[in-house]
Amino acid sequence: MVHAQFDPTSREELAIAAVEAKIAKDLSWQQIADAAGYSPAFVTAAVLGQHPLPPRAADTVAGLLGLGDDAALLLQTIPTRGSIPAGVPTDPTIYRFYEMLQVYGTTLKALIHEQFGDGIISAINFKLDVRKVPDPDGGYRAVVTLDGKYLPTVPF
């Protein structure tokens, strides 16, 4: 049976324990995702409390991290999503995304609506990918792909 989790505290505590275990076992998110059989973005979000994992993946992740049966069950619950507290984020990495949306949010809205019409991009039917690519000018660039299904507004 599918269960919903309404108190984010237990998932937050599990996320802390999972990250501590990940560090202690010197595992990457990619290794955890490979074991679970899903993308690194999805598994990372799930372990950090933003998605439920399917039963087999939850058992695998909990086992790999040494978290036990209770953690495996908790990883399967539908969480209360939204890990950023109200207000402006203070973590520099998260803040840069906030800043990008402050600068380009209206541009994205205008371009999306021009191409698709009135509606939204789903964060449920959604894929996320992060890649590290060489920068021709030296160093590296982060390529972040947000791939969501377009859902048109339907008059009623």
Curated annotation (Swiss-Prot):
Enzyme Commission code(s) on record: 4.2.1.104
Pfam families: Cyanate_lyase (PF02560), CYNS_N (PF21291)
GO molecular function: cyanate hydratase activity; DNA binding
Cited SMART domains: Cyanate_lyase
Domain of life (superkingdom): Bacteria
InterPro entries per record: Cyanase, Cyanate_lyase_C, Cyanate_lyase_C_sf, CYNS_N, Lambda_DNA-bd_dom_sf
Keywords: Lyase
Example of a GO biological process term: cyanate metabolic process
UniProt KW Lyase keyword: yes
Keyword Lyase: yes
Catalytic site positions: R96, E99, S122
Catalytic reaction equation(s): cyanate + hydrogencarbonate + 3 H(+) = NH4(+) + 2 CO2
Classification via PANTHER family: CYANATE HYDRATASE (PTHR34186:SF2)
NCBIfam families: cynS, PRK02866.1
Function: Catalyzes the reaction of cyanate with bicarbonate to produce ammonia and carbon dioxide.
Similarity annotation: Belongs to the cyanase family.
Name of the protein this chain belongs to: Cyanate hydratase
Organism: Mycobacteroides abscessus (strain ATCC 19977 / DSM 44196 / CCUG 20993 / CIP 104536 / JCM 13569 / NCTC 13031 / TMC 1543 / L948) (Mycobacterium abscessus)
